[in-house]
Amino acid sequence: MQIALLSEDPNRQSELEAIAARWGLKHDEDNVFALVLTEQQLELRKRDEPKLGAIFVDLVSGAVAHRRKFGGGKGQSIAKAVGLNKGATPIVLDGTAGLGRDAFVLASLGCKVQMVERHPVVAALLDDGLARAKQDAEIGVWVAERMSLLHASSHDALEQLMAQDDFVQPDVVYLDPMYPHPVNKKKSALVKKEMRVFQSLVGADNDADALLAPALLMATKRVVVKRPDYAEWLDNQKPSMAIETKKNRFDVYVNAAMA
């Protein structure tokens, strides 16, 4: 994939080149999107809209840290959806990891979470954020133990993983495909910014329906699909149950009991 690759820290140019090689990124000087390695972090910028600011993964501070400390623990909807309230601590594969926020919440509650992000730029951002989180004095130890990013950023990532001899099937597959956002629905400024940038970078998630069948084959216990409250079921398949929040819905497809 082509994108502008820029290093603001001369000492990190070789790191940027390694990132580009790992995720298959090629430098395009004129690209509207830039992946920028600063002294602190890897960022995505939309060069024709500088007011949008930079997008980067922060698992240590800000909203993510607040949610970890005050988000409701195992009583929150996402925890119930993956079965944490049943006394189990499932192994979860997050098939649409994005910026890693939901995966981080599940890991903070004790789950081992394998993350798959198919878009190489988003995967590179997540990889950088994960590396920084592992260095943090407060959360680094358990982040390193419980969170991993699988290098599988192609459309058929789930099928590829199942074909690997050493792949251990997860108890739960978690999916949160990007969904078109109606104009009249309110979102926070941060989420609006990210959605705008991501939808113009990644494009519409037109093949999201195709994720459900391989997810159901992969998960030994259940598949959880996060949807906006106004969205139809993924692949038009009715879930076993749904857990509703103010703005979202967790559709749960049960393969087996959590015990």
Swiss-Prot record:
Main location group: cytoplasm
GO cellular component: cytoplasm
Positions annotated to bind S-adenosyl-L-methionine: R101, D102, E117, R118, S153, S154, D176
Keyword Methyltransferase attached: yes
UniProt xrefs under InterPro entries: 16SrRNA_methylTrfase_J (IPR007536), SAM-dependent_MTases_sf (IPR029063)
Compartmental location: Cytoplasm
Reaction equations catalysed: guanosine(1516) in 16S rRNA + S-adenosyl-L-methionine = N(2)-methylguanosine(1516) in 16S rRNA + S-adenosyl-L-homocysteine + H(+)
Example of a GO MF term: rRNA (guanine-N2-)-methyltransferase activity
Alphabetic keyword roster: Cytoplasm, Methyltransferase, rRNA processing, S-adenosyl-L-methionine, Transferase
Top-rank lineage group of the source organism: Bacteria
EC number, as in UniProt: 2.1.1.242
Database matches in Gene3D superfamilies: Vaccinia Virus protein VP39, YhiQ-like domain
CDD domains noted in UniProt: AdoMet_MTases
Family indicated by similarity: Belongs to the methyltransferase superfamily. RsmJ family.
UniProt-listed HAMAP family: 16SrRNA_methyltr_J
Function: Specifically methylates the guanosine in position 1516 of 16S rRNA.
Name this protein carries in UniProt: Ribosomal RNA small subunit methyltransferase J
